[in-house]
Amino acid sequence: MDLKFSQILLIGYRRPDLTFEQLQVLNLARTKSVHIAIDLSDKVIKQKFEAYLLNYQNNFPNITNLTVDFRNIKMGMVQNIHSAICEQFQMHEKLLIFEDDILFTEQTLINLNAILDHYEKAKDFGAVSAFSPLSAKLLPMSSNSKTWRKSIYFPCWGWGTTRQVWQKYNLRISKQEILDLEDTSKTWNNLNNHQKKVWRGRFYKSHKNPERTWDTQFQFLLFKRDLKVYLPMITYSGNIGFNDANAVNTFGKKPFWVQENVSNLDRRNNIKFVRKIMFRVFMFIDSNTFAGDTRVFKFYGKFKILINKLSNK
């Protein structure tokens, strides 16, 4: 029996080959409804997209409802994502969202969808994400709550949320809202001084230039409303952009802990004792690519480099 998936939103840029690969995965997962929002002003790139999508019914027979929106003007990453999500939430209650450089598998979709369905009505629900900085190819993932955890941080590499949450989102953050976090947010007051300093700086940058980011503003929403993100213990998505010269925001900026070949994850072996051990160790580590509390990862990175140097002598 086919699973009932939430609406899928793909965010496309100048790489039709990556979007095509994502559609192949969505087709294998038997998703029915997909919308693609493509930000470009290049006629040649548009023709390439159209060529890839021309025979979509033959290439992706399981996707029965595929819609594509070619932006007439180049909107930029932030406005394209923001507008596409707002437009889709006018028609759908829930969305799973993937930018074109996000790597994911059929199991990613199944798990994200299951967790979104299960926890969307929780009072503290903010989003669900497929990403964690920790990777273990032998660790099985499931929709079982023991392999998922709540975090105050938002990794946007394959994620989902609801219309109810998104209605509270705003690209524009006022100075007063940032100051009010001290009085209104329990989550904010549980951060240490270092974390507050980092996030406050990022929020002020977004205040001055709302077009700079969109995910920082979503993180602000989570803090402001004391909402949580449901994350896997071990990553179920990755980002190909670190190796892609077309990736404006991520090329050449790969954190040391991001694993390669994430798309080849194979977690079908049910190794229960490994999962139990990993859960106990990693339940205390918050996964967020852009978090202000990554000093533990930085320390580990320096330690790892030192060990590698010593081992090569």
Regions found by a protein language model. Give the residues of each.
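An acidic/histidine-cluster motif and surrounding catalytic segment
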Residues: M1-I97, I102-K313
